């Protein structure tokens, strides 16, 4: 798995997708799935998930465990599962967190593996949707 320059390669991919979507608003993207399991996209997704920290999911595997296994091997395994159509998300770990009024609300914690795949999917589809959003719309948008 080649991870050199992943941030720049991902930025170029996103820019290309954005410009294509912006140029032709009626354009439909039918082949984004293969972008999700690109080496650079998965590595960038890993870096973003790692930066967010967070607890392990139902599998009990945390960031440190993945680093001990070997990041390259872990991401290569995810890539193979995605490419072969074998990837299945795990159930989320349910924990109750306190609210200001003293009651509790449920929180679902996905596995780190699922968070990596979710982030990779976000990296691939975000520029396509970003091209259609209005400039006056700010909610949950990067750098807005």
Q: Across the structure, where does each feature detected by a protein language model lie?
A:
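Conserved pre-catalytic core of RNA-dependent polymerases
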Residues: 2-144
